[in-house]
Amino acid sequence: MSFVIASPEALLAAATDLAAIRSTIRAANAAAAVPTTGALAPAADEVSAGIAALFGAQAQSYQAVSAQAAAFHDRFVQLLNAGGGSYASAEIANAQQNLLNAVNAPTQTLLGRPLVGDGADGASGPVGQPGGDGGILWGNGGNGGDSTSPGVAGGAGGSAGLIGNGGRGGNGAPGGAGGNGGLGGLLLGNGGAGGVGGTGDNGVGDLGAGGGGGDGGLGGRAGLIGHGGAGGNGGDGGHGGSGKAGGSGGSGGFGQFGGAGGLLYGNGGAAGSGGNGGDAGTGVSSDGFAGLGGSGGRGGDAGLIGVGGGGGNGGDPGLGARLFQVGSRGGDGGVGGWLYGDGGGGGDGGNGGLPFIGSTNAGNGGSARLIGNGGAGGSGGSGAPGSVSSGGVGGAGNPGGSGGNGGVWYGNGGAGGAAGQGGPGMNTTSPGGPGGVGGHGGTAILFGDGGAGGAGAAGGPGTPDGAAGPGGSGGTGGLLFGVPGPSGPDG
């Protein structure tokens, strides 16, 4: 076969020559326009006048055709210039790629990893593939692939080398955990976010229990400078078949185990929230148990300078019979930076509580270290509605989470979280559940004010209504300077 070689220099030179020819032709046409279009009749007779008019009309037609030819000439010159530029750009790109391949060849051969470049994304499928690692010197990690086969976790995100961001973890298949986020660059880069856990399968037939939701993936840790990746959310539990239990929700990814901020600077990653429990199936003689909600993950800690990540929220239990229909716990906030940074806020607790005593399910605010304010406590979940298993009494509201402590040198304590409301009675003759107690305010150490106490919650409606919960106590002020925090209002 024949080969064609395009030289960008030759194309650009031809375009320049054509432009010069165009200028010469235009000058000649302009010079000929006046004498040809304005030719005078040599005599006053009709024949002379007709000949002059014929020559003038022909000259005008020539000028019109010349204008069209000039426009075509201009377009042709533009196309030649564009073609030459395109060929030149392609040659530069090929040269860069060849240079990049030559640079990456030694490390790719010895270490199985390029020196410069982004990692490839993992393929999605029955088993999600992990993302490729970024270049040793520079490059982002590839994202993990999503899984589709039941119970299989998503692919992990690829890690960066010296500079770059970690890849996102893939989402889990039904009932499978989310993939972990990739690590950020050792020098600079953010950690990748964890993947989302898959939803549990619903029960099949009369005897099928709902499947549990998958746990969320862990957020990726940053290196020296960068923010930690967020943890993935847990999947919801599946619904139970007739008379069978619903699946429990998956837990949120823990930012603490991978979502920490950079050692020098960076915020901790936010934790994922827990999934909701699946609903119980309804049977002829008895109902199944509802699934529990998943716990929220803990926020990631900051390094030297940075803010702690927020805790994830707890999931709610599913609908259906359960003697202890307890809401899942929210995650604690991450700790602030060693030198400077506020603590992260605690996650909210899931709804649901014991008939008479609420479970402590709100996340606590993260504390500061040297300088910084403590994080606010999470809100407590509401009590569960009354049921036959609880004697018709509504569940107690959950207490609010405690605020984090201020920094050792300076910082205010975090505010306590608000309590959850008591659950309503099963019917108009059943008592409502008591309201929860507000969370305690965080303590200041040397300089700073104590955190305000969280608000107490109202009791649930019923006959009689549930007792209101008291507000949380305020935190202690600093030893050298500061005032105590105010107590929270009663419900």
Swiss-Prot record:
Official protein name in the record: Uncharacterized PE-PGRS family protein PE_PGRS36
The annotated region (Disordered) lies at: 114-156, 376-400, 419-491
Gene transcribed to yield this protein? PE_PGRS36
Write out the biased-composition intervals (Gly residues): 128-145, 432-480
InterPro entries hit by this protein: PE-PGRS_N, PGRS_rpt
Starting at the broadest rank, the lineage of the source organism is: Bacteria, Bacillati, Actinomycetota, Actinomycetes, Mycobacteriales
Q: Where is the PE domain?
A: 1-92
Transmembrane ranges, per UniProt, are: none
The species is: Mycobacterium tuberculosis (strain CDC 1551 / Oshkosh)
Q: Which domain of life is it from?
A: Bacteria
Provide an example Pfam family for this protein: PGRS
Similarity comment: family membership: Belongs to the mycobacterial PE family. PGRS subfamily.
